[in-house]
């Protein structure tokens, strides 16, 4: 009697660093758009910071030198991540999540700055929430891609699965499980407190599930849960002084508006259609707090006017459209979800930053990608851009492999048809 043996499937082997594949034209155009945004951002940062740098640091080039240095480091990191195999990143999401949680806990024991604990000081400062956003993109994409597709018919019995059971399993596997790791991150960010980090991280993870192929029922369940959570927060906002002060400055009239928001609106109004000219901002002369960071878009509006603001927005829109094209043409579902998450981070940060600057949303302290000063943010953004390069080249390689396979099949079918002997039934053999 022959006994069948079950062999375990060996884990797929791969090199950590590999050549992803050829460069598609869309990826080249996307990189060109990224380069324009980065150069534009450096010009505006220097214009917004040279007065502040001289008055605060004694060096007009202080902020721009720091940004250029971090840009150099970020480009090196981008090159590294563009060569890292996405399967290695997927395997490291578990250890990366543990490290991220440990760092978020360590931040709570650091010295507060402006009433918040957001920076970890280890010889230099690291904003751990930026690392958390990157980690949650990778982890949420991994869990969402891993969720099995549930059929309404039981494959074993062939019977129809009860609607309630099917819906419950879908909500658990496609919504609750991918978002479960977000809960500890949100709690730790709330203890800092860092409301903008909570909003962005939650919005990014939600966008991954929304655009990643979750059904309408799952989207409805997630949206309903988010609305109920927001309602609960607003009902108990009096017990959170940090949020109450931000909301009061947003809902009341100009007399109670925060100085940052008020000066930001002055800057936008002063710019008019064409602006005061590059370098001619008045509000950046220490009138507008955080002119080099969260409110740099106000300086753009003041110096370049409505035209300059529209150009910045259109550049980001073009960048996002090209990036989403790369994501949706990736080689597998995991890469697609990671690409969606990275583009969602850029989109939400741009939207929230402009909304805060124009007083459409309360002041939450969200930077403008590639424009605002901040080493941790810039380096991690460029690391994510490296992942996008890997995704774009991997998708092009997969496309060429499919085309070659299709051509090979067509060639074999053609050879097979040419080698077939056709017999005429009217002719005797």
Which role does the model predict for each range below?
Residues 2-32, 36-37, 43-192, 354-369, ...:
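Membrane-helix boundary/helix-loop-helix interface segments in multi-pass membrane proteins
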Residues 69-77, 302-323:
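Hydrophobic alpha-helical transmembrane segments
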Residues 94-95, 100-101, 175-191, 195-235:
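Hydrophobic alpha-helical segments of polytopic membrane proteins
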Residues 105, 133, 206-207, 347:
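Hydrophobic residues within the alpha-helical transmembrane core of Major Facilitator Superfamily
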Residues 113-119, 218-312, 331-338:
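Hydrophobic, glycine- and aromatic-enriched re-entrant/interface helices and adjoining loop segments
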Residues 130, 165, 169-174, 178, ...:
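Alpha-helical transmembrane segments of multi-pass membrane proteins, especially transporters
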Residues 199, 203-218, 282-308, 365-379:
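Interfacial segments of multi-pass membrane proteins
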Residues 327-365, 371:
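Loop-to-helix entry and N-terminal half of a specific, functionally important transmembrane alpha helix
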């Amino acid at each position: 009697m022959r006994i069948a043996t079950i062999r375990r499937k060996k884990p797929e082997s791969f090199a950590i660093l590999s050549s992803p594949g050829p460069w598609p034209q869309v990826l080249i155009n996307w990189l060109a758009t990224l380069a324009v945004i980065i150069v534009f951002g450096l010009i505006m940062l220097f214009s917004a910071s040279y007065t502040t740098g001289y008055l605060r640091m004694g060096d007009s080039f202080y902020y721009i030198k720091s940004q250029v240095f971090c840009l150099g480091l970020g480009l090196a990191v981008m090159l590294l991540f563009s060569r890292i195999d996405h399967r290695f990143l997927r395997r490291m999401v578990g250890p990366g999540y543990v490290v991220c949680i440990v760092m978020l806990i360590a931040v709570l024991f650091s010295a507060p700055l402006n009433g918040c604990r957001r920076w970890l000081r280890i010889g230099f400062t690291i904003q751990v929430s930026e690392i958390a956003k990157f980690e949650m993109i990778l982890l949420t994409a991994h869990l969402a891609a891993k969720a099995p597709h549930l059929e309404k018919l039981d494959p074993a019995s062939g019977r129809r699965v009860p609607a309630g059971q099917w819906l419950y399993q879908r909500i658990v596997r496609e919504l609750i499980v991918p978002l479960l790791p977000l809960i500890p991150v949100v709690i730790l960010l709330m203890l800092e407190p860092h409301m903008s980090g909570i909003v962005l991280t939650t919005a990014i993870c939600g966008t991954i599930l929304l655009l990643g192929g979750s059904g309408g029922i799952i989207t409805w369940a997630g949206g309903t849960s988010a609305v109920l959570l927001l309602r609960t927060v607003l009902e108990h906002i009096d017990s959170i002084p940090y949020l109450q002060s931000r909301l009061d400055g947003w809902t009341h009239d100009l007399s109670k508006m925060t100085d940052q928001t008020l000066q930001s609106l002055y800057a936008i109004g002063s710019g008019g259609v064409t602006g005061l000219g590059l370098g001619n901002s008045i509000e950046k002369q220490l009138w507008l707090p955080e002119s080099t960071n969260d409110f740099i878009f106000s300086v753009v509006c003041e110096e370049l006017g409505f035209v300059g603001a529209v150009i910045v927005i259109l550049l980001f829109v073009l960048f996002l459209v090209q990036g989403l094209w790369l994501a949706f043409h990736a080689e597998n579902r995991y890469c697609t979800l990671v690409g969606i998450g990275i583009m969602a981070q850029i989109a939400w940060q741009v939207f929230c930053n402009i909304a805060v600057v124009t007083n459409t949303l309360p002041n939450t302290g969200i930077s403008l990608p590639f424009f605002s000063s901040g080493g941790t943010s810039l380096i991690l953004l460029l690391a994510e851009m490296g992942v996008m390069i890997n995704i774009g080249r991997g998708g092009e390689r997969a496309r060429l492999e499919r085309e070659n396979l299709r051509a090979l099949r067509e060639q074999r079918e053609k050879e097979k048809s040419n080698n077939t002997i056709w017999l005429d039934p009217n002719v005797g053999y």
